[in-house]
Design a protein with these regions (language model features):
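Acidic-and-aromatic substrate-binding clefts and catalytic sites of carbohydrate-active enzymes
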Residues: 9-16, 39-42, 75-78, 104-111, ...
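Active-site gating/metal-coordination segments in enzymes
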Residues: 57-157
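Short, flexible active-site-adjacent loop segments at beta-strand->alpha-helix junctions, enriched
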Residues: 29, 37, 103-105, 132, ...
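Glycine-enriched alpha-helix->loop->beta-strand junction motifs that scaffold or abut catalytic
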Residues: 27-28, 120-125, 144, 148-155, ...
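H/E-rich (His + Asp/Glu) clusters that bind or coordinate divalent metals
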Residues: 13, 180, 186-239
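Hydrophobic faces of well-ordered beta-strands that scaffold small-molecule active sites
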Residues: 3-7, 31-33, 97-101, 124-128, ...
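An N-terminally biased module of ancient metal coordination in phosphate/nucleic-acid-related enzymes
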Residues: 1-78
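Distinct, well-ordered alpha-helical segments
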Residues: 16, 109-118, 137-143, 164-176, ...
Length: 239
């Protein structure tokens, strides 16, 4: 089974028909989906920055730009509506959409929201994004969401903003080995390697081609082990 492990519900993943068409065209069985730009069919072309700076974590640059745009537009306020939209897509695509719920700081009690939506939607993972809004790994908000995910054996997928947040999440993960944690875009893989920190419940998302160089990808494979990474990834995704 082939699963797209990181997509947003906009562009070609906005409607049931376009999702099925995209998956079929690319020979993909399912997609892990979170909210995106609400009701937008727009497609954005991203230059291959990674090829220019193959040894750099260029996601840092896109993080700054994303945060600036989010401050100007306030689009994070649409994420909860986006969660509803992703659930509707799961109901109209015959099992081909796997829902991850995106949690934002606008939710007063994240654990209650997650409890209720788990009953209603049976989602398969939780998403956090430090570029769309400001919160830290050492905040009560993060700890509540992460603890809920750990206690419910639900993967937590996080897009980190900075190197300092990478250091914090490594320290958090050392104390929570049962948390199934996915780090988006190989962010901070260099620090994981430097500290030689890995465990059987730690995963790294490798999207996307324009942001992840072959050099950094090979370093990650050398560190984790290609066979182990693929096996873990497939077991997690299918289950």
């Amino acid at each position: 089974m082939i699963i797209d492990g990181h997509s947003h519900a906009c562009g070609r993943f906005l409607t049931p028909d376009s999702i099925v068409k995209t998956l079929d065209t690319n020979g993909v069985d399912k997609v892990i989906l979170v909210p995106g730009e609400l009701n937008s069919k727009s497609e954005y072309s991203l230059p291959n920055i990674a090829s220019i700076f193959p040894r750099r974590n260029v996601v840092k640059v896109t993080n700054y730009l994303t945060k600036f745009v989010m401050i100007l537009t306030g689009k994070v306020k649409n994420i909860l509506i986006g969660n509803e939209h992703v659930y509707e897509l799961t109901q109209k695509t015959n099992g081909r959409v796997i829902q991850f719920v995106w949690i934002t700081t606008q939710i007063n009690k994240p654990s209650n929201y997650l409890d209720n939506k788990k009953k209603d939607w049976n989602f398969k993972g939780v998403k956090l994004h430090q570029c769309w809004e400001s919160f830290s790994v050492d905040s009560d908000f993060f700890k509540e969401v992460a603890l809920w995910a750990e206690n419910n054996d639900i993967p937590l997928f996080i897009h980190l903003y900075s190197d300092s947040e990478v250091a914090k999440i490594i320290e958090y993960k050392k104390k929570h080995l049962n948390l199934n944690l996915i780090i988006a875009h190989l962010f901070g893989i260099e620090l994981f390697i430097k500290l030689n920190f890995k465990d059987e419940n730690l995963y790294f998302d490798t999207s996307t081609l324009q942001l992840i160089s072959k050099n950094r990808l090979m370093n990650a494979i050398d560190f984790v082990g290609a066979d182990v990474l693929v096996q873990r990834e497939m077991e997690f995704r299918v289950n």
